[in-house]
């Protein structure tokens, strides 16, 4: 099976981020952000990101509408605003996007991209990466300092108990509990539908 990368753009300068991708031979960036725009790092707005990648010789593919961590369908959320990954995984559009990714991974070195530098609690790892690894693919994470980190190392770090706390009794979640680690609802609802 194929291997694939994940990489968060964080608040890097575009040149720094492109250097990280080039350092690891990434040929295609798959943008997995539901909303590929940012008021904090506008250099990573969808169109600007695509242009920068293409100028660097890296292809760009947007699949955030199908693989994003904030699905449009309210049926994929629990009452606390967490995304129900176990349901989303069974969505026909999600499945089609996974199949498209797998086809691309046979031909190119692919990186799944979103905004978070740390993949530990990001949907690109917890949702998309989990589905792909369950299908036999290997996930590697390009970190902000340039190092490549195995998913086992990320998982081990994510499950370390905080100082002075007890370790969790049940490290693995059953399918009914497989969901985002935090609410993805906005902290403050928009005033109207045209406000972002």
Predicted regions and their residues:
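Residues lining hydrophobic/aromatic ligand-binding pockets adjacent to catalytic sites
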Residues: 1-196
